[in-house]
């Protein structure tokens, strides 16, 4: 290893971001999407599944949406906003965002 590589390696900071922080970023982004009603709990109580993949962060969300929204457009907007927020704050790529619509809330 050259001196330059050692210096570069020593300058690299090591840190870890708690899953609750990432979940908070995702929830913040979801609040900006008009048609989202709630994040649904999964079988094991998880609202948001976070995976660390070789190519970046993988996310899985189970959502309840508000009645009257076009699902394809809503999913696309949700993925875009979540990806932007997570990448902006963490400076790490988001490799995938899986969204499962678990229900539609009828609001009178």
Model-predicted segments: where are they?
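N-terminal, Lys/Arg- and Ser/Thr-rich interaction peptides
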Residues: 1-9
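Short, highly charged C-terminal tails/helix-capping segments
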Residues: 93-108
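Intrinsic low-complexity, intrinsically disordered or marginally ordered coil/linker segments
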Residues: 3-4, 49-50, 105-107
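N-proximal, solvent-exposed amphipathic alpha-helical segments enriched in charged/polar residues
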Residues: 10-48
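Amphipathic, heptad-repeat alpha-helical segments used for oligomerization and assembly
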Residues: 63, 67-71
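Short edge beta-strands and adjacent turn/loop segments
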Residues: 33-64, 101-103
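Short, non-transmembrane amphipathic alpha-helical segments
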Residues: 71-90, 94
